[in-house]
Amino acid sequence: MEWELLADVPADALRKLLSVARRRTFAKNEVVFHRGDPADSLQLISKGHFSVQIATPLGDIATLSVRGPGDAFGELALLSRESVRSATVTAIEPGETHSVYRDDFERLRREYPSVNDVLIGILAEHLRRLSEQLIEAHYVPANRRVLRRLREMAELYRGSANSVVVPLTQEDIAGLAGTSRATVNRVLRQEERRGTIELRRAKTVVLELDELSRRAR
């Protein structure tokens, strides 16, 4: 398994880092950590998908992102000893991660100064995501944001089959798109009538990913 976050880490440093990482397995719907928990480790995903969620001021649960194999979460734990988890992360299906604890990472930084590039990459990625979200929120209509998030999730879950099952609720998609469930339902119903998707209980089947991608531009 390769992780984009660690792509620039020297091979010998990467081997050492993974040798001290601790393998963890999670059942479907098992919580990895809650928002506000002490943050002490980076989680590298090797199997399964994980939702990153927060509670809104109104008490609703908003899904901020979904991460899959080759991705990671909990990156901010490597930046500060005083940090706490900024969101709750839950396994969408059975999954596996490799935990890199901050103390182990600090020792590796001292031995391999080039590992500092990982921290720079973390900050750069967070800034990129925040910038994209801000631009979309101001300039991209809600219906297109819904289609873009559905396309991204379909690409994340895509296998060898022609159709792609996205096991997320409409509330999840609303959180990802920064809009209401009613808007998501309206947009998805329109797409179902066009034949690009099929709606099922707590999931969406993408039948025409190329067409969905074209409409999401």
Question: Where on the chain are the PLM-derived regions?
Answer:
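A residue-level structural signature of the nucleotidyltransferase/glycosyltransferase Rossmann-like core
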Residues: L6, L64, T97-V100, V165, ...
